[in-house]
C-alpha cells in the first residue's frame, strides 16, 4: 500500500522519534508550524495537497480537528485518515499505557509547552517579550488580560526534545506571568500508529469520497 503522511511542523521532532526503528517509512510532507491559528487557510492548504496526491492508496494527516480546519475535507480516490483528537497537544498527552477516558486531557487554566511549541513565532514567551518591549510599565496589565485565566504552565516531555530547553522556556514565562511550572509525561504513541498504519479507535478512517465531520471527533458522544 502506498501511503502519504501530511504532518504539522509543530510535531517534527515527535514524528522523527516515531519513525525510529521502522524498516519501511511512508512519504512525509511537512507543513509550516502555526497553521492551527488559521483554520480556513489550513483547510485550503490541506485540500490542495489531498487533491494533488490522488495517486496514493491512503493519505494520513497528523492534524486533528484543529479549530475545525479539517472539517469538510474529502479525498475522492484514496482513504483519508486522521487522529481522533482536537489538536496536537491532546495527541501528545495521550498515553497508551493509561488508555483514554475522555475527549482531551487538556485542563482549564493550564498552558502547555513542547519543544515544538516554544519554537513557534507566536509562542507564549515570544508574546510576553513583545508586549513588555512594546508597552513597558503597562505590560503587566495587558499580560493579565490575556493570560489571567491561567495558573500553571505544563512542560510536556515526549522524549523527542531537549526537555531542559523547554523547561528553561517555561521558567522564563514564569518571570512574566504568575504561574507555577510543572513537568508532565506525554508520548508519541499516536504518531507511532500513524507511521506504522496500525490504527485503533483513536483514528478516523474515511473511505474515498467521504467527508470529515466534527461529530467524528467526539468521544462517547461528547
Model features per residue range: what roles?
Residues 144-222:
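Extended, basic/helix-rich recognition subdomains
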Amino acid at each position: 500500500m502506498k501511503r502519504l503522511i501530511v504532518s504539522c511542523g509543530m510535531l517534527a521532532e515527535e514524528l522523527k522519534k516515531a519513525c525510529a526503528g521502522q524498516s519501511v517509512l511512508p512519504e512525509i510532507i511537512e507543513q509550516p508550524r502555526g497553521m492551527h491559528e488559521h483554520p480556513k487557510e489550513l483547510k485550503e492548504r490541506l485540500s490542495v495537497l489531498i487533491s494533488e496526491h490522488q495517486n496514493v492508496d491512503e493519505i494520513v494527516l497528523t492534524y486533528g480537528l484543529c479549530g475545525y480546519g479539517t472539517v469538510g475535507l474529502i479525498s475522492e480516490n484514496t482513504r483519508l485518515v486522521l487522529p481522533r483528537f482536537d489538536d496536537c497537544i491532546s495527541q501528545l498527552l495521550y498515553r497508551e499505557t493509561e488508555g483514554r477516558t475522555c475527549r482531551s486531557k487538556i485542563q482549564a487554566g493550564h498552558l502547555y509547552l513542547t519543544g515544538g511549541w516554544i519554537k513557534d513565532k507566536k509562542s507564549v514567551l515570544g508574546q510576553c517579550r513583545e508586549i513588555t518591549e512594546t508597552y513597558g510599565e503597562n505590560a503587566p496589565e495587558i499580560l493579565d488580560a490575556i493570560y489571567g485565566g491561567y495558573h500553571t504552565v505544563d512542560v510536556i516531555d515526549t522524549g523527542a526534545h531537549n526537555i531542559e530547553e523547554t523547561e528553561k522556556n517555561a521558567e522564563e514565562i514564569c518571570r512574566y506571568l504568575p504561574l507555577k511550572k510543572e513537568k508532565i509525561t506525554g508520548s508519541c504513541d499516536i504518531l507511532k500508529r500513524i507511521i506504522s498504519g496500525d490504527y485503533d479507535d483513536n483514528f478516523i478512517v474515511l473511505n474515498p469520497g467521504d467527508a470529515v465531520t466534527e461529530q467524528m471527533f467526539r468521544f462517547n458522544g461528547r
